Amino acid sequence: MSLRVPPRWVFAAPASAFLAAISLAGCVESTSEIAPGVDSAQFVRREDANMAGATMAIISIEGAPQELSGQFRQSLDKAAAERQIAVAPPASAQYLIRGYLNASPVENGARVDFVWDVFTPDKRRVQRLTDAMLVQGAGDDAWAMVNDAALNGIAAKCADDLAAYLSNTPEAAPAAALSYAQ
């Protein structure tokens, strides 16, 4: 009696399924406690940071309907100023930011996910920040649930995330930390 060896694809299929499940595991988050994504390190804003040292320019924000995009950008600019984030023209900024927003309906409202890719001027991505907020409401159109108050809250959370990251960059090191080098 001879033993038949199964084809190689029999072993490859479960391995591929396992790898796909592992790579998607970071995409599943609970709506009751929204945790940061796998690629997003948790940063705590340094209170002693020199925020003027880490300049940024927002290059683009994609995903929101056009009528909300302008409002969101204004809210984000205001929230960034309140957090002393130094905004500069793209040609002179130390960090270039690309944002992505996505809203999807969930039970009792909408979930708005946001992703910020942080690049150096030579277009090398140095960080991806991900976060999400829940918006209360009803209906099938998740973006229709995002009112002015929700939009301002999302912009404030985005500014908090960006400020926390930027405050931990070398350019934002407090002056006292740099005095030893002089």
Residue ranges of predicted features:
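Amphipathic beta-strand/beta-sheet edge segments enriched in Tyr/Trp
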Residues: 105-138
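Envelope-exposed proteins and targeting segments
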Residues: 52-54, 81-83, 93-97, 110-114, ...
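C-terminal motif of bacterial Sec signal peptides marking the signal peptidase cleavage site
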Residues: 22-26
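A short, hydrophobic beta-strand-centered structural micro-motif
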Residues: 87-105
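Bacterial N-terminal signal peptides that target proteins for export
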Residues: 2-16
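C-terminal/domain-edge helix-coil "capping" segments
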Residues: 28-44, 135-182
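Post-signal-peptide N-terminal segment of Sec-exported extracytoplasmic proteins
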Residues: 45-83
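Solvent-exposed, acidic/flexible segments
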Residues: 65-73, 105-109, 144-155
